[in-house]
Amino acid sequence: MEDYKFLFKIVLVGNAGVGKTCLVRRFTQGLFPPGQGATIGVDFMIKTVEVEGEKIKLQIWDTAGQERFRSITQSYYRSAHALILVYDISCQPTFDCLPDWLREIQEYANSKVLKILVGNKTDRDDREIPTQIGEEFAKQHDMYFLETSAKEAENVERLFYEIAAELIGQARSKDGSASAAAAAAQRQSEGGSIGLGSFSAKAAQSNCCGGLASGGGGGSNSSQAG
């Protein structure tokens, strides 16, 4: 039987085609699946990692972006420890729909859930949403922020490891560990996080559009599923 100290449930949400599936597979399998199709309903993968000397099991749930699956995916919000809200930096409509996703999160998720805004596909050279706009949106809504590229593996491991570190800090804090706040502050001072709005966003340059009612997938050279 596998030994681990913590089990955390992380749920990815966002429009179809923003790259949710590719982020999950890049982190859990080290793969970028070209031509990845849309997620049907909900899928999940597990990865055990070591963070701050603790063995952590991450249960990562990949949800469909299509409207017809919404009632299914909403049921997974409430038990989530962290919610990653993903948009495509090269597709304005995926950013414009963020308020709709946030309303869902506020309605169905635990009020204390850790929320992270992720601008994916930074390998793309046709950026439509500047990094600063993403950062400002995250700060306005008390979310952490990071830009990633599942295709180039840019900031993908960092995203999940920092989430795990934050969740460990919360768990220790609940257990009365006085060092939790200090550890979190140290991570921030070392560039792990910038206040409550950012995981220290570091832009590079990644595609695929998809309205809130479209699909959950994305692609190869020019797109990342999700």
Label each PLM-derived region with a short phrase.
Residues 79-99, 109-113, 122-128:
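Conserved Switch II/interswitch segment of TRAFAC-class P-loop GTPases
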Residues 78-79, 140:
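Alpha-helix C-terminal capping/helix-to-coil transition sites in glycosyltransferase folds
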Residues 45, 70-75:
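Conserved alpha-helical scaffold flanking the Walker A/P-loop in AAA+ ATPase domains
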Residues 60, 84-88, 117-120, 148:
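Conserved beta-strand segments of the P-loop GTPase G domain that flank and frequently precede/overlap
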Residues 56-69:
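Switch II (G3) loop of P-loop NTPases
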Residues 29-55:
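Switch I (effector-binding) loop of TRAFAC-class P-loop GTPase G-domains
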Residues 1-17, 21, 55, 111-117, ...:
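Conserved P-loop small GTPase signature centered on TRAFAC-class small GTPases
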